[in-house]
A protein has these predicted regions:
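Phosphate/pyrophosphate-binding loops at sites that engage ATP/ADP/AMP, CoA/4′-phosphopantetheine
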Residues: 37-47, 168
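Condensing-enzyme catalytic core mediating Claisen C-C bond formation in acyl metabolism
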Residues: 1-24, 36
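Single conserved hydrophobic/aromatic residue that forms the stacking wall/gate
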Residues: 162, 166-171
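Acidic, glycine-rich active-site loops and adjacent beta-strand->loop/helix elements
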Residues: 10-13, 54-58, 87-91, 115-125
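Flexible glycine-/small-residue-enriched beta->alpha junction loops
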Residues: 110-160
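Short catalytic helix/loop segments, enriched in acidic residues and glycine
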Residues: 21-39, 137
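Conserved catalytic cysteine-centered active-site region
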Residues: 24, 55-110, 140, 148-157
Length: 171
């Protein structure tokens, strides 16, 4: 296995819901921090083989290509692969783990990785609109709230923290 080194790290500020970053695209934020991280690393963009980013809540159509948009926007080659991962709260960390594995296995000599999310821009989904809401009300689903609720009926994820915290073993 190849050794892995972190050459640089950057991040944006953590914004509050509906705060000063609410109108910022996760792609634009990702490009800004990736460009800065590459600049600090001392590597040229053509020396970076792969980009991996975590993202859960798409805020616009191009977010389906968020990793590709970030890497190309940060100056990486069009030919460099990009991968988006969704592991809910752990997506950014999973991106870093996956990039580490690429380098360890020799599938990349250098990679960029991170997460890009603007929950304030989480949209609403109206399933009936695809084929037409013919008569009656069309239900809307808050995709941000959907991402914060356990799909197996256990409730809001923040509530789950309060449930699990008292039951974890004391170290």
């Amino acid at each position: 296995m190849h050794d892995v080194f972190i050459m640089s790290a950057t991040r944006t500020a953590i914004g509050g819901f509906g705060g000063s970053l609410k109108d910022k695209s996760p792609i634009d934020l990702g490009i800004a921090v990736t460009s800065e991280a590459i600049g600090r690393s001392g590597l040229a963009t053509d020396e970076i083989d792969h980009g991996i980013y975590g993202n859960v809540i798409h805020t616009e159509a191009r977010d389906m290509y968020i990793s590709r948009c970030i890497t190309i926007g940060a100056g990486m080659a069009d030919s460099s692969p990009a991968l988006t991962v969704n592991r809910l709260c752990g997506s950014g960390l999973q991106a870093i783990v996956s990039a580490t594995q690429l380098v360890q296995l020799g599938d990349a000599s250098a990679a960029v990785a991170g997460g890009a999310e603007v929950m304030s821009l989480g949209g609403y989904h109206v399933p009936a609109m695809r084929w037409g809401a013919r008569l009656g009300h069309a239900e809307m689903t808050d995709m941000m709230l959907g991402a914060l609720h356990d799909p197996f009926g256990l409730g809001h994820m923040l509530s789950l923290i309060h449930i699990s915290e008292p039951t974890r073993p004391r170290l």
